[in-house]
Amino acid sequence: MSLVEHFDATLSADPNTRTKAELSLKQLEKEPSFVLAVLQLLSSQEISLPTQQAAVIYLKNRVSRSWSSIDDAPSPLDIPEEQKALFRQNILPVLLQSPMSTRSHLMAILNIILSTDFPEYWPGFSEYTSNLVHSTERCEVYAGLICFHELAKVYRWRLDDRQRDIGPLVAALFPTILQLGQGLINLEDNDSAEMLRLILKTFKSVIALELPPELLANDMILSWIQLLLAVVQKPLPESLMSLEPEVRQSHVWHKCKKWAYYSLNRIFTRYGEPSSLVGDSANKYRAFAKNFITNVVPNILETYIQQTILWTQGQLWLSPRVLYFLGCFYEECVKPKSTWALLKPHLQLLIGSFVFPQLCMSEEDEELWELDPVEFIHKYIDIYDDFNSADVAASRFLVKLASKRKKYTFMGILSFASDILNQYAASPPNEKNPRQKEGALRMVAAVSNSILSKNSPVAGMMQDFLVAHVMPEFTSPVGYLRSRACEMINRFSEIDWSDKSQLLNAYQAVLNCLQDNDLPVRIQAALALQPLMRHLEVHDVMTAHVPIIMQNLLFLANEVDIDALSSCMEEFVSSFSHELTPFASQLAKQLRNTFVKLMQETMDESTTVDDFDSLVDDKSIAAIGILNTLSTMILSLENTVDVLREIEAILLPMINFVLDNNIFDVYAELFEIIDGCTFASKEISPIMWGVYEKLQKVLKESGIEFVEEATPALSNFITYGGKEFASRPDYIAVMVDIIMQVFNSEHLAVNDRVSACKLTELLMLNYRGLLDQYVPAFIEVAGNLLLVTEKPTSQTYRVFLLEVIINALYYNPSMSLGVLEMHQWTLPFFALWFENIPSFTRVHDKKLSLVAILSVISLGAQQVAVAIQDSWGNIMKVMITLLNTLPEALAARAELEKEYDGETFNLSGSGWNDGIDWEADDDEGVDDFAVEYGGPDLGGEISADVVDDFDEFEHFQGNYLLDEDPLFHTLLDQVDPFSLFQEFMVHLKDNSPVTLQDLVKNLEASEQQSLQRLVTEKPSTLAVASDKT
């Protein structure tokens, strides 16, 4: 069977024939010259189009998999270098003569090769491209544009080597393709449009991250802008207007317009607005930006306004994508003074005739509501699915006007919407326009943040507004008005309801909509319940309806996948945990089934299980929300062991499903569930021990990158699994294996090693006497990182590594000192430890250091003094410092524990808009030239040479891992350090007075006073009063 016959057979209707052909191809593809043979097949003009398509798709997948090997391990599918060289020589001629149906795939193949081979293995590609572009043959010019476009795409997001690798080509070809584009725009045929499209997309890729110097030189960029404006203004061919809108959008002339709009917007937002330029960009583009916003933006805005006017008059068709770009540009013009001055005269047109129509339901929207309500939800309710839509851009423009130019626009926006609503209310039933009312309500919802802000002049009117214009629509025969009514209550639920009966009426209306016939209405009702439940009056009434509401939420979760619904369920479970406890098992079973259904559907949609970990879609996001809801429910059941055991059994198949299928996307949330089950019951059940065995296997084989997320669960196994750990050395060995794998890995981050430090510490604290064979290795790995290889500058990382060795000293001081001495680390370790005492801020840190010091001294003062030499004289100073600072740490921890124990949701608290002040924003706008020197320094630069990856995190976020954690408990909680210290001092006084004298001889007067207080006052008194001396 020939190669052509093989690809013919893959298209057969007979599954056996297809399977046989595919298996045969898998054998053939191991031949070194196979990819070249398929490429040569594509050069034949005699092969049918379907066969060519089957062959080119196969070839694209084969090149994608095997052109660049991921690792050094040889594979039968590797393409030999000599075959690659021949393939590079032949692909461009094949591409040149290929039909459109296969050309896009060949372009993708070219892109894959360029991304790995240029310029090192294909140095002649630039010259070849240049020769094609400068050819007098139109087909060769077209091929050159393809080559240039693919190369520009490869370097679109690369900055490091861009100027070196393609800078000369940009300098050589941009004047040529600009001139070519200026000629093509005057033509009407589709081939010319295709060439112009490639030119515009090449320009788009080149300016994605920077404006090349070649464009800024001699103002070439201005000539390009003129070309882009000409494309924007060019009428589409008359023949297009007879086509359906969806077909028009895919036409090549429309694509030219789309990329012209895109590039004009990109230049303005990234390089042309002076006040938004910071750092290096300000230095590079300041001069260009000043000229651009003064002399170019007015022309762009005038062109955009002209296009908008023609669209509003029905004289011009604009696609949703073009409307999106227009909305984005207008939004960017609101803040700068100069562009605001140009935009202001057109506000009535833009608000009334551009924004408002896009916010109204269209005939297509109503059809979508009826025929595909799930898709309607994703488009208009779960808006992150369609964040780049025209109506969302129009809404954002409205929001920017209301927030940044509110004194000029806000009341006008509300007046416009109010007029529409009043007209609707006054019209007889047969003349009411529900689309316009829904659009007006959507306008009001869009500016809700400004309406609800502090000192807002209209916030106090919103109850009457809702009663007049929203409440009646809960019984409207028009489904999308009922949906919008729910959404309006959601947006404005936090107003000050002076009439609580109206609040309860709103709740009842929303609750009724939870049973609505239309799915979008039920979804909006569910989402509206979330803010309503925060009102005490509603919360109390809702208690009676908890089971039925939860049941409805679960039904909805099975019908549609949106993240907001998961958030609603999570808060509902948290707020009504007591009422839901009797139904916890049933709820867990339903949530489990919904989760597994979503995951199974997602796995079925992906081409292979291997692709699953990178697949993020609506279903996986919704599944994550379900896991979060389960976690919340589990924690609400703390100490109800019987119920927790039932839930563990229910969730076990789900846990196994995720771990068995390596569903990395949900590992973090799954580990939280395991953490919750083990923490809430404070013991480890047989079911969870089975999970422990599977968890360690998963971490070892494929998931060690998730050790940080798994650490809380692993910590619980150590803390609450004492009996099993003590009787099962293999359980301890498994934990140690995980720890050492993290420490020895070269690709894990510092925060992962901090997690390993935490697990090491818990083992040594909980299993004294059972870890003798492992402790020397713990000391060696931590000491090597701390004192030899890394010497971390990160405070957090350094403290956790220090505490591994400090724990070892407490565990077995003699053994640990021996290991330190063997490596000659004793002196530097103690010096580093005592030097970093101020960083030991938590109660646990201070107790640990104190008990470790006392354990070391117990070995024999003279022996220890010789071993640590200079640090010996500081031991008493360190202990006094630890004890003096401990009361403050104890008080801080007690306060955190009090907050945690009494933690409830603030049902009567004010809303999240409290932080937004009506008077806060500067309605004068931003001066166009406000940023002259790159903006402020946000804390100084971080040197990559001296700062590790954790330092950068600390630089911006602080040492949060060293903050007190009220949920962190160890056996040291039972230690009274003040009593322990007093007993130690009595023992020294009675048995080693010389050692005592040696320890206190270097104390300052203030330190002696502190010591006197520490040994004479009651421990209970010391624990609550800090040293005043």
UniProtKB/Swiss-Prot annotation:
- Localization per Swiss-Prot or TrEMBL: Cytoplasm; Nucleus envelope
Q: Name one Pfam family in it.
A: IBN_N
| Keywords (A to Z) from UniProt | Cytoplasm, Nucleus, Protein transport, Transport
Output the Gene Ontology cellular-component terms: cytosol; nuclear envelope; nucleus
Mind telling me which InterPro entries this protein's record contains?
Answer: ARM-like, ARM-type_fold, Importin-beta_N, XPO2_central
HEAT repeat feature ranges? 506-544
Q: Domain Importin N-terminal, which positions?
A: 21-97
In alphabetical order, the GO MF annotations are: nuclear export signal receptor activity; nuclear import signal receptor activity; small GTPase binding
Query: GO biological process annotations for this chain's record?
Result: mRNA export from nucleus; protein import into nucleus
Q: Which PROSITE patterns match?
A: IMPORTIN_B_NT
Q: Does the keyword Protein transport apply?
A: yes
Query: What function does the entry list?
Result: Active in protein import into the nucleus.
Q: What is this protein called?
A: Probable importin c550.11
Q: Which organism is it from?
A: Schizosaccharomyces pombe (strain 972 / ATCC 24843)
The beginning of the lineage is:
Eukaryota, Fungi, Dikarya, Ascomycota, Taphrinomycotina
